[in-house]
């Protein structure tokens, strides 16, 4: 697809019903984790995790918590805006959905945490 260049920058939010949100300047979009039922990483809405890679919102780019934290940390520690390219493609690139060993890539509907969240690395 046709790529559009944008920038992520320090206007960030560690919590707002998602983890590690970073604003994409020049758009109304944020890059952030899947949705939670509040400001706790133990209140994940499992269906939003299982829906990663599908079109669920009109503006935001949702990624697994581990990738959201990586992007957040890069944006927060960088002095300047960081260029990114957003485009539609079947190639998921480095931020494609990670399927953990011995899993289907989906989580049970009653699971309340993201298995890629660094806070839960011992539960993997």
Please tell me what each predicted stretch does:
Residues 3-124:
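Exported/periplasmic cell-wall-interacting domains
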């Amino acid at each position: 697809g046709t790529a559009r260049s944008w920038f992520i920058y320090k206007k960030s939010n560690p919590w707002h019903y998602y983890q590690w949100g970073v604003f994409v300047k020049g758009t109304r979009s944020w890059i952030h984790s899947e949705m939670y039922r509040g400001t706790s990483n133990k209140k994940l809405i499992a269906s939003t995790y299982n829906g990663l890679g599908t079109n669920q919102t009109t503006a935001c780019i949702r990624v697994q918590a581990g990738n959201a934290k990586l992007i957040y940390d890069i944006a927060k520690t960088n002095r300047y805006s960081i260029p990114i390219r957003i485009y539609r493609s079947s190639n998921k690139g480095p931020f494609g959905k990670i399927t953990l060993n011995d899993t289907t890539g989906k989580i049970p509907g009653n699971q309340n945490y993201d298995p890629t969240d660094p806070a839960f690395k011992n539960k993997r």
